[in-house]
């Protein structure tokens, strides 16, 4: 008998009543968070049999929720969301004992703080790598990038604005951190504006600790024809380079060559304070039949997966000497739900709480 190698979703029962904008896994892949235009977010836990169970669902903003991200578990179960209502909200899971049975534990998501200093729609947020502490970068439709830091990593209710950068004078759509411990931290910002200013759609900043500021790297010029919908640094860096993948119509892969002055010493101390020279090399163009929307690296940085506007998930694998080959291609239309899944989906829609009831949850 031939085995069924088709890929099937774990679960088709939805939690949202409107368009889902973001799906985010925690660093261990055991938990998942989703957010949507219905102003709600949901937390999912993976069961031992591989299925996903919805453990929480609540209204978290006063507008459409664009992003939801997880902090590293070292800082606790912390989730951040950003929204059309111009705010960023930090949530933390708290374990409490049931009043009926003291041995039984229940979890609640508590709103720790609301960051509301943005004057426009917040389009993306990203936590820093854990070796930098509990920090977060955000970008908005006015082209501003803000960097926040929690001075006490055990207190998620206090966040200070430490830097504000004007990346563009047009809309910012995505922001990401470099993950390397060996080099000075980098932040890459992408613009999804159709008419980019001077054709600049990607800006990269370098953190110079001795100067206590983020410096724009003007030597890195990306010639990209389409708006930037996503960009990510590879989790694995070479000694002399970073790798950056950019979704701009197709998926573009770049190596960013690092100068010796940007490489940290073994104890994490910088070389003499000076601006480093970076060189940009385009190593691959991963074609997409439709506009690439989101992209991710795997843990080893050897596979890039992207989702497209045609509902297709494509994956490419790196071989050697900067060669990439297509690994797989899956389309959501190829999956036909069973009658049991259809009935479960309809049942979930009729039994879900009303939005007015969701407002009272965890507030």
Swiss-Prot record:
| UniProt keywords, alphabetically | Lysosome, Membrane, mRNA transport, Nuclear pore complex, Nucleus, Protein transport, Repeat, Translocation, Transport, WD repeat
Q: Where are the WD repeats?
A: 15-54, 60-101, 108-149, 158-206, 223-264, 287-326
- GO molecular function list: structural molecule activity
Null allele outcome, as annotated, is:
No visible phenotype.
Question: Which coarse location class describes where this protein primarily resides?
Answer: nucleus
Q: Where are the transmembrane segments?
A: none
Answer yes or no on keyword Lipoprotein.
no
Which is a Pfam family this sequence falls into?
Answer: WD40
Q: Which GO terms describe its cellular component?
A: lysosomal membrane; nuclear pore outer ring; Seh1-associated complex
Q: Mind listing the GO biological process terms from this record?
A: cellular response to amino acid starvation; mRNA transport; positive regulation of TORC1 signaling; protein transport
Transport as UniProt keyword: yes
The protein's location, in the record's own words, is: Nucleus, Nuclear pore complex; Lysosome membrane; Nucleus envelope
How would you summarize the oligomeric state and partners of this protein? Component of the nuclear pore complex (NPC). Probably part of the GATOR complex.
Task: Tell me which family the UniProt entry assigns to this protein.
Answer: Belongs to the WD repeat SEC13 family.
Q: Which PANTHER family match?
A: NUCLEAR PORE COMPLEX PROTEIN SEC13 / SEH1 FAMILY MEMBER (PTHR11024), NUCLEOPORIN SEH1 (PTHR11024:SF3)
Q: What function is annotated for this protein?
A: Probable component of the nuclear pore complex (NPC) which is involved in the trafficking of macromolecules between the cytoplasm and nucleus. As a component of the GATOR complex may function in the amino acid-sensing branch of the TORC1 signaling pathway.
Protein name, per record: Nucleoporin SEH1
Organism name: Caenorhabditis elegans
């Amino acid at each position: 008998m031939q085995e069924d190698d088709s890929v099937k979703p774990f679960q088709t029962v939805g939690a949202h009543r409107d368009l889902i904008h973001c799906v985010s896994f925690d660093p261990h892949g055991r938990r998942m968070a989703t957010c949507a235009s219905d102003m709600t977010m949901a937390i999912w836990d993976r069961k031992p049999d591989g299925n996903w169970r919805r453990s929480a669902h609540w209204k978290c903003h006063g507008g459409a929720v664009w992003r939801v991200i997880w902090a590293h578990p070292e800082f606790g179960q912390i989730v951040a969301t950003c929204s059309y209502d111009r705010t960023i909200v930090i949530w933390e899971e708290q374990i409490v004992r049931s009043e009926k049975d003291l041995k039984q534990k229940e979890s609640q998501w508590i709103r720790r703080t609301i960051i509301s200093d943005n004057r426009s729609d917040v389009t993306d947020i990203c936590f820093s790598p854990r070796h930098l502490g509990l920090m977060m970068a955000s970008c908005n439709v006015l082209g501003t990038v803000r960097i926040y830091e929690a001075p006490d990593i055990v207190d998620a209710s206090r966040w200070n604005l430490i830097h504000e950068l004007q990346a563009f004078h047009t809309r910012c759509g995505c922001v990401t951190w470099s993950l390397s411990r060996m080099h000075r931290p980098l932040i890459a910002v992408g613009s999804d504006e159709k008419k980019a200013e001077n054709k600049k759609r990607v800006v990269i900043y370098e953190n110079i600790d001795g100067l206590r500021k983020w410096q724009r790297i003007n030597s890195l010029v990306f010639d990209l024809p389409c708006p930037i919908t996503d960009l990510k640094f590879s989790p694995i860096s070479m000694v002399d380079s970073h790798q950056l993948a950019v979704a701009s119509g197709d998926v573009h892969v770049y190596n960013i060559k690092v100068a010796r002055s940007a490489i940290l010493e073994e104890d994490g101390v910088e070389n003499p304070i000076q601006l480093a020279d970076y060189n940009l090399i385009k190593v691959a163009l991963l074609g997409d039949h439709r506009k690439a929307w989101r992209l991710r690296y795997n843990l080893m940085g050897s596979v890039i997966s992207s989702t497209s506007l045609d509902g297709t998930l494509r994956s490419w694998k790196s071989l050697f000497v900067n060669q990439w080959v297509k690994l797989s291609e899956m389309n959501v239309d190829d999956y036909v739900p069973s009658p049991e899944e259809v009935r479960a989906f309809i049942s979930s829609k009729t039994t879900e709480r009303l939005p007015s009831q969701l407002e009272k949850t965890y507030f």
